[in-house]
From Swiss-Prot:
It holds the Pfam family DXP_synthase_N. The gene is dxs. Catalyzes the acyloin condensation reaction between C atoms 2 and 3 of pyruvate and glyceraldehyde 3-phosphate to yield 1-deoxy-D-xylulose-5-phosphate (DXP). InterPro entries: Dxylulose-5-P_synthase, THDP-binding, Transketo_C/PFOR_II, Transketolase-like_Pyr-bd, Transketolase_BS, Transketolase_C, Transketolase_CS. SMART domains: Transket_pyr. Thiamine diphosphate binds at H72, G113, H114, A115, G145, A146, N174, Y287, E370. Mg(2+) binds at D144, N174. This is 1-deoxy-D-xylulose-5-phosphate synthase. Pathway: Metabolic intermediate biosynthesis; 1-deoxy-D-xylulose 5-phosphate biosynthesis; 1-deoxy-D-xylulose 5-phosphate from D-glyceraldehyde 3-phosphate and pyruvate: step 1/1. Homodimer. It comes from Synechococcus sp. (strain RCC307). Keywords: Isoprene biosynthesis, Magnesium, Metal-binding, Thiamine biosynthesis, Thiamine pyrophosphate, Transferase. It catalyses: D-glyceraldehyde 3-phosphate + pyruvate + H(+) = 1-deoxy-D-xylulose 5-phosphate + CO2. Its cofactor is Mg(2+); thiamine diphosphate.
């Protein structure tokens, strides 16, 4: 069967192991070809090809439910659920999403993008099934990295107390989440993987037998029986932790042996209660470069399949904000042993991998445990350390109670660096950093700021570390503005003071963070039409520089705010409230993300769709205030 002919996963029923292996080969070829061209998650999907095929051969996907944790490993799932012919549009605007979306396919039973949610969702489906007298199967597929998340453990604890509720949890254990997983549970799983029977199961012994001249590529049944016996005898406590929590434990199973997987899943489906099947896989399986560098090939931009190297940029780019942050933090840590960098399993993405290599004693990775990361930092701050929590804007949402209860209320000096703040692009709505402005500006005692460029980022980091209270700094995804960075001697900013960048009498533009450069470009376009704008780099969301903004708004009489975040409760709303409280009631235009989700596309495409490019913003300003500008407006449409 050719993969392109597979329109429904139930068509896998009845295929032999060799036929499934041929489908697996085609999936890997398509997966590699597509990701090498368009970019995307590489290693996770390559590691679960056989797992996916074997699982789906034992299910009826018209009725049964499968919840994939995170969803970045579900490319094989997409390829066998009718999206083969559209797969070349992966992560592109209006194309196939990089994660699971209920709106994209009836086979995407639960959407995701964040880790550790699958067991809770699948258990909820199982309870709904039982209450409605139905009989379909409910399955959660979760990686060993996501299993470190507290939510996953909460769900396991709950499911274990429901002995009559049929639930299958498939643990995809590749000893890798994005960065290597940490913690006692991960260490326990690792001991399982490194036990002699497990090494025999997944190591070179079977391959050596298969290649003996007289074996003709086959493995005798006796060897399989020996392997199973060794597992039972030498690793009797492998699943003890899950058995104690109320699950029937099966495994470990070779995650690339389709026959063994099918037999195990069939046995698991016969159980009357919760079952955990432990599957040992290799992240990046089938592509040597991805197997050798499982962190580097977790996700990739477009790359050369032959060499495994990313294609060079068409023109040199400035360093990313993440890299500038990481390099600066390393230097600050070298100067002050009290500074500690904390990540929640995202060291590479946030730039903290640089700290891990340079000053490992001042680096902490808590795993996928954002709530713990925040309160851990609070505890450190209580006793004299200077914690810096580097975390994606979208993931900090998961620790909101800790921000308020453990840090804000107690006014503890913790510095938060929110990476990927604003529009992030192809990862789509689960990863857009569009909410942090709104959810941070109301937290008591917090100072909130955003830099206009790399050099200002460095100064803000120093500001945070010298401030005796909680402070949050948001930085966008991608390259900086190309402003030279200082090697040392960074001066802190005066908290609550903005920066006047340009002066004009017709319009006041107040921009925040990544929107400062577009604001200046917009002002330049307006200047060409005879409109002179004052431009302010707000720097601080909380506290706002009311001493600067109020007199300017009162004098100029027309205000535009620009932000890369939600308009609801956002930066523009903060400016409007501040002016209103001072009885400055002037016409305003707030530019940002309206009340909608931002779907997957490139950042530039998303900004175009939202009307946030400089030509579009200039046009919107002219439409809003055109009559007030009178004869000075040399009207022409700038956005095309």
């Amino acid at each position: 069967m050719h993969l392109s002919e597979l329109s429904h996963p139930n068509e896998l029923h009845g295929l032999s192991s060799s036929e499934l292996e041929d489908v697996a080969r085609q999936i890997r070829e398509k997966h590699l070809k597509t990701v090498s061209t368009s970019g995307g998650h590489l290693g996770p999907g390559l590691g679960v090809v056989e797992l996916t095929l074997a699982l789906y051969q034992t299910l009826d996907l018209d009725h049964d439910r499968v919840v994939w944790d995170v969803g970045h490993q579900a490319y094989p799932h997409k390829l066998i659920t009718g999206r083969f012919n559209e797969f070349h549009t992966l992560r592109k605007k209006d194309g196939v999403a990089g994660y699971l979306k209920r709106s994209e396919s009836s086979f995407d039973h639960f959407g995701a993008g964040h880790a550790s949610t699958s067991i809770s969702a699948a258990l909820g489906m199982a309870i709904a099934r039982d209450r409605q007298g139905q009989n379909h199967k409910c399955v959660a597929v979760i990686g060993d990295g996501a299993l470190t998340g507290g939510m996953a453990l909460e769900a396991i604890n709950h499911a274990g107390h429901l002995p009559k509720t049929r639930l299958l949890v498939v643990l995809n254990d590749n000893d890798m989440s994005i960065s290597p997983p940490v913690g006692a549970l991960s260490n326990h799983l690792n001991r399982m993987r490194l036990s002699p029977p497990m090494q025999f199961l997944t190591g070179s012994a079977e391959e050596a037998v298969r290649h003996l001249p007289f074996m003709q590529g086959q493995v005798p049944a006796e060897l399989n029986r020996i392997k199973e016996g060794m597992k039972r005898l030498a690793v009797p406590k492998v699943g003890a932790v899950f058995e104690e929590l109320g699950f029937t434990y099966m495994g470990p199973v070779d995650g690339h042996d389709i026959g063994a997987l099918v037999r195990t899943f069939q046995e698991a489906h016969r159980s009357e209660g919760p079952v955990l099947v432990h599957v040992a896989t290799t992240k990046g399986k089938g592509y040597p470069y991805a197997e050798a560098d499982q962190v580097g090939y977790h996700a990739q931009s477009a790359f050369d399949l032959t060499t495994g190297k990313s294609f060079p940029a068409k023109k040199p780019k400035p360093p990313s904000y993440s890299k500038v942050f990481g390099q600066t933090l390393v230097k600050l840590c070298e100067q002050d042993s009290r500074i500690v960098g904390i990540t929640a399993a995202m060291a590479t993405g946030t730039g903290l991998d640089l700290l891990q290599k340079a000053v490992p004693d001042q680096y902490v990775d808590v795993g996928i445990a954002e709530q713990h990361a925040v309160t851990l930092a609070a505890g450190m701050a209580c006793d004299g350390l200077k914690p810096v929590v580097a975390i994606y804007s979208t993931f900090l949402q998961r620790a909101y109670d800790q921000l308020i209860h453990d840090v804000g209320i107690q006014k503890l000096p913790v510095t938060f660096v929110l990476d990927r703040a604003g529009i992030v692009g192809a990862d789509g709505p689960t990863h857009q950093g569009q909410y942090d402005i709104s959810y941070l500006r109301c937290v008591p005692n917090f100072t909130v700021m955003a830099p206009k460029d790399e050099a200002e980022l460095q100064r803000m980091l120093v500001t945070g570390l010298r401030h005796n209270g909680p402070i949050a700094l948001r930085i966008p995804r991608g390259s900086g503005e190309g402003v030279p960075c200082l090697e040392d001697g960074w001066e802190p900013l005066e908290i609550g003071r903005g920066e006047l960048l340009a002066e004009g009498d017709d319009l006041l533009i107040v921009a925040y963070g990544a929107m400062v450069a577009p604001a200046m470009a917009t002002a330049g376009l307006l200047q060409e039409q005879g409109i002179r704008a004052t431009v302010v780099n707000a720097r601080f969301l909380r506290p706002l520089d009311e001493a600067l903004l109020v007199p300017l708004a009162k004098r100029i009489g027309r205000v535009v705010t620009m932000e890369e975040g939600c308009l609801a409760g956002g930066f523009g709303a903060a400016v409007m409230e501040a002016l209103h409280d001072r009885d400055v009631l002037v016409p305003m235009l707030r530019l940002g993300i309206p009340d909608q989700l931002v779907d997957h596309a490139s950042p530039d495409e998303s900004k175009q769709a939202l009307g946030l490019t400089p030509p579009q913003m200039a046009d919107r300003i002219c439409e809003r205030f055109g009559s007030a500008f009178g004869d000075r407006l040399q009207r022409q449409t700038l956005s095309v």
